[in-house]
């Protein structure tokens, strides 16, 4: 093809009608079409550069999700806990904004916004942390504080948390250094009493001190591929300075510490008068928690200082538990309906059954965590027989199934 007859493969314009005509293999593109392509990519929030794969800095080549967008995503998975969601969203947004603009705070030292979640068992602490990491597309790992020990003791030392985090991103150090670590049951490693221990304990203050080093930022030496440490071995160095740590716990008994502080009262103008009702709302008390309360509970002051954002979660009531059963994308009722649907059987939960399930979970003090075991128990026999029940059209779970252990109603094709 002569130069004069060459045309853009996209718009059909000839070389004489455009400034530039770029030649490829058996194709041409003009400068105008290139400009249009760039505009389209910008409108899609992509500047044309390849984005980082899963587990890197959140949406590196695109827009960092705003706090409102993060909360909207959390609403799809977690019912209620609006204040906790806002606190988490703002802290996480500020954290990754700080990482994206390291030079912006050249004259100001921007601290890391590590988070402490306080709330009863089954209120959604773990699910919130998991959902956050999923939305931000960063490596995420969970650790149980009760299984951790100081280095040198039998058990899982705190540096193994970083080993697990590396494993989540195929030992990509850069990705791991921007990940999220959730440490559950942090309240279970509180030291006994207000005064520091004379001797270090394996599972209490000593573990807090070890965690403190990770949280405030240190270079952890991790064995390659997660193996055990041994002499003459090369280690992977991971800087934990920019890893976001979220700690959670039920803090049973903390309300007594807060009540003791607030009920001291006084005489004169400005003195607070507080009720000594033992049935005072624990959620409201958690909402006014102060660092001094956490110190009295048994957390060391240095650790509390590294967890500047404190978010409290409410105990879930009956209506909230019913919503958890039916509303989120991963709602239990929807999950079981999908399983039954695979056998071409409709599954229905009556309102009375849902309320009974929620009531039993509240009585067990297990919150949302206890819902699955209750539903599983009432459907176990039916699911066992389901593949062999020819002509079954519908299964109805009523109140009596939950409260009296009766079989669900089976509706067959007529």
From Swiss-Prot:
Pfam families: AAA_2, ClpB_D2-small, zf-C4_ClpX. One of its GO terms (biological process) is cell division. Residues 1-49 form the ClpX-type ZB domain. The keyword ATP-binding applies. Residues 44-65 are annotated as: Disordered. It comes from the Bacteria. CDD domains: RecA-like_ClpX. Keywords: ATP-binding, Chaperone, Metal-binding, Nucleotide-binding, Zinc. Zn(2+) binds at residues 8, 11, 30, 33. GO terms for molecular function: ATP binding; ATP hydrolysis activity; ATP-dependent protein folding chaperone; protein dimerization activity; unfolded protein binding; zinc ion binding. One of its GO terms (cellular component) is HslUV protease complex. ATP binds at residues 120-127. Belongs to the ClpX chaperone family. PANTHER family: ATP-DEPENDENT CLP PROTEASE ATP-BINDING SUBUNIT CLPX-LIKE, MITOCHONDRIAL (PTHR48102:SF7), ATP-DEPENDENT CLP PROTEASE ATP-BINDING SUBUNIT CLPX-LIKE, MITOCHONDRIAL-RELATED (PTHR48102). ATP-dependent specificity component of the Clp protease. It directs the protease to specific substrates. Can perform chaperone functions in the absence of ClpP. HAMAP family: ClpX. Component of the ClpX-ClpP complex. Forms a hexameric ring that, in the presence of ATP, binds to fourteen ClpP subunits assembled into a disk-like structure with a central cavity, resembling the structure of eukaryotic proteasomes. This is ATP-dependent Clp protease ATP-binding subunit ClpX. It comes from Neisseria meningitidis serogroup C (strain 053442).
């Amino acid at each position: 093809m002569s130069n004069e007859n060459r045309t853009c493969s996209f718009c059909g314009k000839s070389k004489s009608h455009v400034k530039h005509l770029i030649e490829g293999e058996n194709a041409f593109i003009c400068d105008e079409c290139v400009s249009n392509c760039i505009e389209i990519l910008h409108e899609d929030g992509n500047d044309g550069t390849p984005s980082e794969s899963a587990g890197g800095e959140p949406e590196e080549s695109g827009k960092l999700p705003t706090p409102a967008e993060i909360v909207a995503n959390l609403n799809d998975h977690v019912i209620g806990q609006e204040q906790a969601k806002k606190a988490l969203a703002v802290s996480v947004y500020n954290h990754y904004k700080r990482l994206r603009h390291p030079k912006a705070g050249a004259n100001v030292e921007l601290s890391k916004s590590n988070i402490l979640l306080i709330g009863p068992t089954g209120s959604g602490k773990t699910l919130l942390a998991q959902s956050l990491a999923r939305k931000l597309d960063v490596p995420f790992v969970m650790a149980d504080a009760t299984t951790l020990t100081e280095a040198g003791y039998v058990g899982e030392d705190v540096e193994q948390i970083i080993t697990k985090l590396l494993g989540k991103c195929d030992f990509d150090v850069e990705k791991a250094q921007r990940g999220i670590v959730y440490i559950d049951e942090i309240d279970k490693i509180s030291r006994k009493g207000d005064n520091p221990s004379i001797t270090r304990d394996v599972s209490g203050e000593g573990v807090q001190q070890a965690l403190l080093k990770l949280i405030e930022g240190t270079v952890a030496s991790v064995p390659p591929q997660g193996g055990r440490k041994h002499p003459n071995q090369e280690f992977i160095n991971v800087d934990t300075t920019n890893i976001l740590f979220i700690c959670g716990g039920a803090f049973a008994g903390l309300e007594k510490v807060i009540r003791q502080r607030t009920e001291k009262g006084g005489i004169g103008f400005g003195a607070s008068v507080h009720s000594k009702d033992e049935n005072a709302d624990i959620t409201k008390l958690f909402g006014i928690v102060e660092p001094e309360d956490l110190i009295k509970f048994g957390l060391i002051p240095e650790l509390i200082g590294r967890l500047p954002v404190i978010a409290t979660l409410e105990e879930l009531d009956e209506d909230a538990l019913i919503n958890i059963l039916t509303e989120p994308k991963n709602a239990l009722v929807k999950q079981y309906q999908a399983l039954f649907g695979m056998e071409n059987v409709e599954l229905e939960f009556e309102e009375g059954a849902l309320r009974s399930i929620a009531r039993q979970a509240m009585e067990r003090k297990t919150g949302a965590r206890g819902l699955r075991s209750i539903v599983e128990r009432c459907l176990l026999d039916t699911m066992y027989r389901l593949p062999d029940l020819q002509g079954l059209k519908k299964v109805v779970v009523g109140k009596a199934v939950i409260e009296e252990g009766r079989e669900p109603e089976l509706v067959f094709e007529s």
